[in-house]
């Protein structure tokens, strides 16, 4: 057991170390419960301290990731490690800062093309509350392209073959890009954190960023309904500013700092 865990330690993976240790301990405990073993050799091994990730992509990494996804989406990169539909969904994550699980379970009924809003039902959000996401023209274009690329008109927007979900493949997409030498040492969630950090650097207050990310604190039902709609305009301004900033990075134009409006 120590030899196994030492190999993980040498790789600098404390989270993996703790997960493997817990799994091994459960296996031995099961053996004791079945009277196959008389002791658990993993029981006295201490956990490794875990630090929350604070990884944020640099402008160069962000631009590089976008260019890779764009090449895959448009079919100009030979033998891509992920599908064009996965690349399209990841680009929407970069445009909207929403969780991958929410993007890849998006259904056509959740999207209002006319008003430019994506409504994520509480059954799909992490905090269980309905979340309204403003869609910029660039974000809507990705969704429209998915429709013309064989997805819809019913069911999932970013669907695989025969309309099947890509949620599981999406969890591994950034890792596949990294193993192919097309992405750096970052995760899908780091991409979302990068957008949040970018909004902060553009001058938006934490309250607006929290509502963009759907991380606002819970409260009375009336308060939650008020907050959800009260921040629609702020969320729209924030994601439009982020879209301009992202486009500026992609095209080599520096964005100016935004001074958010106040009501």
Regions found by a protein language model. Name each.
Residues 4, 58-63, 70, 115, ...:
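Active-site/catalytic core of tyrosine-dependent DNA strand-transfer enzymes
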Residues 1, 24, 28, 103, ...:
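Short, basic/aromatic-rich helical patch in the C-terminal catalytic core of site-specific tyrosine
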Residues 10-23, 33, 37-105, 114, ...:
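Basic, Lys/Arg- and aromatic-enriched nucleic-acid-binding interface segment
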Residues 92-93, 198-199, 212, 228:
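Short alpha-helical segment immediately N-terminal to, or the first helix within
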Residues 109-117, 183-185, 204-227, 247-260:
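Short, polar N-cap/turn motifs at the start of nucleic acid-interacting alpha helices
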Residues 67-75, 125, 145-154, 159-165, ...:
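C-terminal secondary-structure termini that scaffold catalytic or DNA-interacting sites
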Residues 32, 93-94, 178, 200:
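Alpha-helix C-terminal capping/helix-coil junction sites
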